[in-house]
């Protein structure tokens, strides 16, 4: 089916396919381009563009950028304009369509599972990268036999795959927002809850065509909230739309639990050593893969004897580090050009140091941009260990929130709401358009749910001093449901003063700094879900991967709790069904949810608070 160029490029942009840099005024060094079909060990050939500096007075390192989204047809001058920071330093830049995509041969398998390293005849993205490096070293003139690989999102996942069975010449890996576990916390699931709208649209985009499919061919409604609600049972997706043509959807539907398929696809079994210097990059408001780079850093860190595993987290959405200044996201102003700072002062020095042997990268163990305070913080360890104390933010009566434990109560104290799958809470303001709003929804003003009776909001008094939260946050929810299954969504929010002098339009703004969901059926086991005992208090721990935020004096802290987040998260029937994808409309029911806040069932948010060092 033919697709217009405008549609194609929209979806390329949405998925952030390019590892790109914003053009900058710099003396550009010309490239010469050579196109090649590089053979893999099984005979499949991969479409590759090689851009080498025109000058030959020195040998240059090779930087590989692999993608499933199409490498395009950039001229040497266009590439020089697109990557000025790297152009001025001198790199051989290699772009490659992965197996089965665009002009490369073979069969595409989305997020192909790692092969057994002992099976030298099997192929995966690691072996394809190895074979590509081997060919480049032998066939590209003036290379210095040092190779790096970099990418964003899927491209970052490909970069991490290169580490599993690395070529000896691999000397640097830059993974920017790589997924690490598609069931636990990245694109397709969060703590067992299926990311419906993203999963459906992305799977269609990737698997309905060898190029880029357009989800508007399926979703023809102005407000996608309405389309997904009318969809009814998720079984209707396969019956009415996909009809066996989208393999990943079948995986979603047939493997709802954390089975060996998802575990083998995750990086946890494989990342047991640091095989190359690694720069892990994340964005605080990454709407797709915030969990991944944090998890990859944590998996590698115990094995990092040579101190070559680094973490950088900035105030970005998915791919925000690679384009523009990075001064604002939505309405949130960070006071400086954070993306430019990353590219010029972190990324390029890292690559130059490890691939050219020049200078020092100057990186600490971890570097985070502290939102609220709008400053870069250098850490000796992540999460921070010095000058940090664990504190608890307790839910209180009258929808208050404070660090003080609730007073003893003769009876269990709770707040309640009714959750209705027929009227789920939208995850962002409606209409939820297919072609806009996705990249900034995590920084939307959360006041759009103020009128909803199925959202509980607990808020503190105005702070008398700054409260800095840095590290891992865990929501401890003591809750019951009248049903036998339930989702629990918890959001931590910075509430701006009603009168915000520096920017009056931001008065009262509610900025979500952390939020996630937990599917109740997985409380005891992610592998073997169980019905929740009705009307019985259960303790749910909902982890947030990381945070570094300053709640400023005069601001307030808010915690919101709800049980639907639609359609980013599929609807829970609130009645235990062994496979929610097979739930019928008659299985969906309302449920009365209770959030407890006293005695041993005192719901709270555990936060690591930065304290002043002793004098």
Range-by-range predicted roles:
Residues 141-153:
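Alpha/beta-hydrolase fold nucleophile elbow
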Residues 274, 280-282:
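Short beta-strand/loop motif that positions the catalytic acidic residue
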Residues 151-161:
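Glycine-rich nucleophile elbow surrounding the catalytic serine of serine-hydrolase chemistry
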Residues 219-235, 321, 326-615:
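C-terminal, loop-rich substrate-recognition/catalytic regions characterized by aromatic stacking residues
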């Amino acid at each position: 089916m033919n697709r217009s160029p405008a549609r194609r490029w929209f979806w390329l942009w949405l998925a952030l396919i390019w590892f790109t840099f914003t053009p900058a005024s710099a003396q550009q060094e010309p490239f010469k381009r050579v196109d090649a079909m590089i053979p893999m060990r099984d005979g499949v050939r991969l479409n590759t563009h090689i851009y080498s500096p025109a000058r030959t007075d020195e040998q240059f390192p090779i930087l590989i950028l692999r993608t499933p989204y199409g490498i395009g047809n950039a001229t040497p001058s266009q590439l020089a304009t697109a990557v000025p920071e790297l152009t001025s330093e001198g790199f051989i830049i290699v772009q490659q369509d992965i197996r089965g995509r665009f002009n490369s041969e073979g069969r595409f398998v989305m997020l192909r599972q790692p092969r057994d390293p002992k099976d030298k005849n099997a192929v995966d993205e690691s072996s394809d990268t190895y074979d590509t490096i081997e060919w480049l070293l032998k066939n590209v003139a003036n290379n210095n036999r040092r190779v790096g690989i970099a990418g964003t999102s899927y491209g970052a996942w490909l970069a991490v795959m290169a580490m599993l069975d690395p070529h000896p010449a691999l000397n640097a890996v830059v993974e920017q927002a790589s997924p690490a576990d598609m069931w636990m916390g990245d694109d397709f699931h969060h703590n067992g809850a299926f990311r419906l709208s993203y999963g459906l649209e992305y799977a269609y985009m990737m698997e309905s065509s060898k190029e880029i499919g357009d989800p508007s061919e399926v979703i023809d409604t102005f407000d996608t909230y309405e389309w997904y609600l009318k969809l009814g049972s998720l079984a209707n997706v396969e019956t009415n739309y996909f009809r066996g043509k989208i393999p990943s959807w079948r995986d979603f539907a047939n493997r709802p639990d954390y089975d060996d398929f998802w575990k083998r696809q995750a990086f946890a079994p494989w990342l047991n050593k640091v095989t190359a210097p690694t720069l892990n990059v994340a964005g605080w408001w990454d709407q797709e893969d915030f969990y991944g780079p944090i998890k990859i850093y944590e998996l590698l860190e115990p094995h990092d004897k040579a101190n070559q595993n680094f973490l950088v987290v900035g105030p970005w959405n998915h791919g925000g580090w690679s384009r523009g200044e990075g001064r604002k996201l939505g309405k949130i102003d960070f006071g400086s050009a954070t993306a430019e700072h990353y590219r010029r002062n972190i990324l390029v020095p890292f690559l130059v140091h490890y691939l050219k042997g020049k200078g020092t990268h100057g990186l600490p163990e971890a570097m985070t941009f502290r939102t609220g305070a709008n400053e870069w913080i250098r850490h000796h360890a992540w999460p921070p260990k010095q000058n940090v104390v664990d504190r608890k933010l307790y839910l209180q009566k009258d929808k208050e929130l404070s660090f003080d434990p609730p007073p003893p109560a003769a009876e269990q104290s709770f707040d309640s709401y009714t959750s209705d799958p027929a009227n789920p809470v939208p995850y962002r303001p409606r209409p939820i358009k297919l072609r806009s709003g996705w990249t900034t929804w995590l920084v939307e003003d959360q006041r759009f749910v103020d009128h909803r009776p199925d959202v509980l909001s607990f808020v503190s008094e105005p702070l008398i001093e700054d409260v800095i939260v840095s590290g891992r946050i865990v929501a401890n929810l003591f809750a019951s449901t009248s049903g036998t299954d339930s989702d629990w969504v918890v959001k931590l929010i910075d509430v701006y003063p009603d009168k915000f002098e520096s920017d009056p339009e931001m008065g009262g703004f509610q900025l979500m700094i952390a939020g996630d969901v937990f599917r109740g059926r997985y409380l005891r086991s992610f592998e073997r879900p169980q019905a929740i005992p009705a009307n019985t208090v259960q303790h749910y721990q909902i982890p947030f991967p990381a945070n570094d935020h300053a709640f400023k004096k005069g601001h307030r802290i808010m915690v919101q709790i709800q049980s639907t987040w639609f359609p980013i998260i599929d609807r829970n029937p609130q009645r235990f069904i062994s496979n929610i994808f097979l739930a019928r409309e008659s299985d969906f029911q309302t449920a009365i949810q209770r959030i407890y806040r006293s005695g041993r069932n005192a719901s709270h948010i555990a936060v690591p608070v930065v304290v002043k060092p002793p004098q």
